[in-house]
Each structure stands twice: as structure tokens, then as C-alpha cells.
A protein has these predicted regions:
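N-terminal accessory/capping or targeting/presequence segment of soluble
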Residues: 1-96, 107, 111-196
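Ligand-binding face of N-terminal immunoglobulin V-set domains in extracellular IgSF glycoproteins
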Residues: 100
Length: 196
């Protein structure tokens, strides 16, 4: 299959495909739903590791039935998304010297620390690379670029100014100088904006 050529071309033994997008959101737009495109699985939480011999999809308990209906069992193993099951699968399928590729743009720091820890324990090399799916997804939908709209106070419950004032009170009480908000849904909530 095509993925074997990409693995060989990039000198990798396997590649990680998480569900999350560049904003690490649970609900991704169609243009960022890489896991769905490559596996057929349409749930909102999961991760796949694909290598030359086999592949796995990790999903949480909400999706154990759904993943078996949507993804081909002749190609994918199905596992629980728990850290222990991920460790077990990696230990059994990624031997010493294994080169495991990942796109740093769509892996959280928490996930990276987990992968780094198990890579060190098992002598696996983590390799930053371009996203495999993006290289082969020729009919990928366009990224959303709809206009930003104001979410009226009658829907949000509070205007931005009041939210900001309350947030500053909490920061002052906790003696915090600043707050970095990286999740887009939190930014939208604070600013009372939405988009499509």
C-alpha cells in the first residue's frame, strides 16, 4: 500500500496519526480529520500507529463498537486508548532501533512526553517529520475560512468585558502576572466570538 512507500521514503518503520488537529481540538473540521480519512473511523477521540506489517487504532470506551464497524479489521487492530494499552502495543510492535515518525504540529506536549518516555525505555527513535496524511490526501477539503461572528450576550450570558474582569480578579488573587490561552475554544468563549 501507499503508506509503505512513504515509510520507506522517509526512512521510518512506523508513523503516528492522532485524531487532534493543529489546535489539539476534539472536534476537528473535515480538512483536519486525518484519522478518519486514513482509517475510516469517525469518532472524536483516537490515535493510529501504522507500520509495514500492521496497524492499530486506539479508541476510548465510547467507540469500541463504532471503530469495528467503520475501520477494516483485516488491516487494523483495535485497542483501548488507555496509556497502558498504548505502551503494551508499542512494546510488542516497535522493537529496539524502531524509527517512529510523528508530526509535531498535531501532538500535544503531554502525548510527546509519554512517547519520549516509552521511546527511551524501549530504545525507539522518535522522528519529527511532515504529516504523512497531508502528503497523500489529494482530495482534502479546504480549511474553514468563514467569517468570525460575535456571540451575543443573550446567548453567552456575559459580555467580554465582564469575563475579562472576572478573569483578572482570579489572576490577581492567585498572584499570576499573565495567562497564555492556547486552546481556540477557550479564546472564542472569552472573546464571545464564533466561526464556521
Amino acid at each position: 500500500m501507499f503508506y509503505k512507500l512513504l515509510l520507506k521514503k522517509n526512512n521510518l518503520d512506523g508513523f503516528i496519526i492522532p485524531h487532534e488537529d493543529e489546535f489539539l481540538t476534539e472536534y476537528t473540521p473535515p480538512s483536519s480529520d486525518r484519522l478518519h480519512w486514513i482509517t475510516g473511523f469517525s469518532g472524536s477521540a483516537g490515535m493510529s500507529i501504522i507500520n509495514e506489517r500492521n496497524a492499530v487504532i486506539f479508541v476510548d470506551g465510547r467507540y469500541t463498537t463504532q471503530v469495528k464497524m467503520e475501520s477494516p479489521s483485516e488491516f487494523f487492530d483495535f485497542e483501548d486508548l488507555s496509556i497502558e494499552r498504548q505502551k503494551k502495543w508499542i512494546r510488542e510492535n516497535c522493537k529496539s532501533g524502531y524509527k517512529l515518525g510523528f508530526s509535531p504540529k498535531i501532538i500535544s506536549s503531554t502525548k510527546f512526553k509519554f512517547l519520549e518516555k516509552i521511546a527511551n525505555e524501549e530504545s525507539i527513535e522518535l522522528v519529527e517529520c511532515k504529516n504523512f496524511v497531508d502528503q497523500i490526501w489529494l482530495d482534502r477539503p479546504n480549511e474553514p475560512n468563514g467569517e468570525i461572528i460575535y456571540h451575543e450576550e443573550k446567548f453567552s450570558g456575559k459580555n467580554f468585558k465582564d469575563k475579562k474582569t472576572n478573569l483578572l480578579k482570579v489572576l490577581n488573587k492567585e498572584k499570576v502576572d499573565s495567562l497564555f490561552i492556547s486552546e481556540s475554544d477557550n479564546t472564542c468563549w472569552l472573546l464571545n466570538i464564533r466561526g464556521h
